[in-house]
């Protein structure tokens, strides 16, 4: 190769029009004619976005660009035509541009690459050199003789043979054997040598160790060692000289018995398997071929399968979760996760107690178990469990058949709950407690009583609010009275309790008697220490009625009975009506005297038992001090105490006399218990008897009550005095007496009920006749005002009330007016107020004290013998 080498080859050359004509021109013309023939195969549609695909001017149809030919849906083949046609060893890489084929180089691509080069323009170096040659296109090595390996780097070790070019294994020449073909074979011409073992293998028709014996098997081979004939197909016998009669099978080589092929049976294997069977000896059953079609007798294949079956032999059910023809349907979900039937799609099985295509239906009543195949036993008052068949009892019964009632103390389902009743007598079904007849009545009565109490409380609250708003006596008060009223809050609170009692309905107590009343002054600053009248004993003489406004529910009691409060008017500075002047009373006498005399022991001033609610309420609400009364239950005293009181002898009553019935016309409308007293009347208290009186009980035999304790406290304290004021002109004597201020409190501790002891040590003592006359004047004034009130009420309409029985009246002789202590004028603003003419003030309804009652006849007789009631 002169001046030509692989490195000096030009890249590519362009054929010009003036080049020499190609020697391959006739062949190219033939190819062009073939290309111009109509194509019998429809060309593939071009991809508008493919390589070298263009659009013709004025058309939207894609076509290959100039110089390119279609290859698939693109234009990937370059075309070199005309003067640009490539030679035999050239390839067209671009339109009108040729390049040398791999393995060739030169100006005309007519020079083959040297052994050590390959590829385009012989630019790639061959790695097999010098023991092999590279392929021009791929560069794969082809080793020379006696060389092997990927790069022909290994030498072949076979002595009488060749090596495999990749593995190097030896291929021995005939007559040689061994790993490297180094051993020679010693076999006759009727045999060949085994290259691995070197043993001689006899040719067909020869047998023996040296393969020198010929077989006598009628052209059939024989065993190499024994020479026994190995008959060919369809022959049998010792020499393979008999013809086999089997139609679809093989004959036994000795006796010629037929061994039928699968799908046939019979002596000569002429009978195919019956429908539904296939295989060797027709022993296997066909699968679920559709429509009872027979399967192939040899393999058992079916043309189509029944619904729910799959496989070539239709012997495999549908996979889990599928069913139907061709196993193309998906099973709907079954209850409890069970699979569906591969043929019908229904659930294969259900849990005990459920049936249906989807196991969605419970067993009907009376059956239970799997597929509801079992019948329930009799469950009495219960029902059968649809799963287990066990009787489920209703509340109140138990047992295997639900026919046993719950024992006492238990209830509910299966009697599993304990009763919460006191005596375990509850309903076995609901557990409600059974009440006996008396218990039911008690519960009903308690409910009714509760309703009545609620109604009563609501009524009391309503009445209190209504009466407080309608009280005509409430009016604006001066600032000083308001300040004094704050100090007397306990007394007003006591009065409000009495107002509640006045709103209660009147309850007739026809078989009770009025109690005895003992009046004693209490300190104005005393704490809340009042109660109401004690209900008379039911064993005494019946009375027409007793005002329910005298409550028996609260306040203090003493050894002699309960204590109730009677408010009196305020002092001049504390008076509710500032327009009415008041006259202070003189200081009490130095020596106490009894309130009654033997001459007045036969009569007693009657005291009414009822009172007007509004007047009594207004009087109790006053800020002034209160008169307290004790209801003394008289006990049997010695004859000496019974016969004389305060040193005065009284003749005992010969017999107990029943008092005559009261006159309804003279019954007052206002009770002295709640009536408003004037300051003067309340202030003139009788003097107590001397300490040595036999009628006074011993101090050691008498308990100290809260009222006595308060009285004792005031007694040892500093004495309080009031400035006496003169009676204003024009004011009647009775009004003056009623308006007089209240004297200091008197205590009766240790001197018997009704005996008053002055606590004011500063003033002169008052005589007994003087005190008696003042008390009589007060009572006469109250009686007159009561009469005027009755006349006024009679004009409006009489109120019929049952009159209480009257006791024998004991009168107190009036004291001489000359003995009344003179009133001294008090200078100050009060005097200027009294100089003015006093306006006419409304008369207060002053009740009269009701005579007390005794519990027994002996007590009544003792009262008659004792004389007048102790005030």
Swiss-Prot record:
Subcellular location: Membrane
Cysteines paired by S-S bonds: 75-86, 80-98, 100-109, 126-134, 128-141, 143-152, 156-163, 158-170, 172-181, 185-193, 187-200, 202-211, 215-222, 217-229, 231-240, 244-251, 246-258, 260-269, 376-384, 379-391, 393-402
Signal peptide: 1-43
InterPro entries named among the record's database cross-references: EGF-like_dom (IPR000742), Growth_fac_rcpt_cys_sf (IPR009030), LE_dom (IPR002049), MEGF10/SREC1/2-like (IPR042635)
UniProt note on tissues of expression: Predominantly expressed in endothelial cells. Expressed in heart, placenta, lung, kidney, spleen, small intestine and ovary.
Record-listed Phosphoserine modification sites: 551, 613, 651, 653, 710, 718, 742
Ranges annotated as biased composition (Basic and acidic residues): 570-579, 632-643, 705-725
GO cellular component terms, A-Z: focal adhesion; membrane
Cytoplasmic topological domain residue ranges: 463-871
Disease: Van den Ende-Gupta syndrome: A syndrome characterized by craniofacial and skeletal abnormalities that include blepharophimosis, a flat and wide nasal bridge, narrow and beaked nose, hypoplastic maxilla with or without cleft palate and everted lower lip, prominent ears, down-slanting eyes, arachnodactyly, and camptodactyly. Patients present congenital joint contractures that improve without intervention, and normal growth and development. Intelligence is normal. Rarely, enlarged cerebella can be present. Some patients experience respiratory problems due to laryngeal abnormalities.
The protein's assembly and partners: Homophilic and heterophilic interaction via its extracellular domain. Interacts with SCARF1. The heterophilic interaction with SCARF1, which is stronger than the homophilic interaction with itself, is suppressed by the presence of SCARF1 ligand such as Ac-LDL.
Name assigned to this protein: Scavenger receptor class F member 2
Organism annotation: Homo sapiens
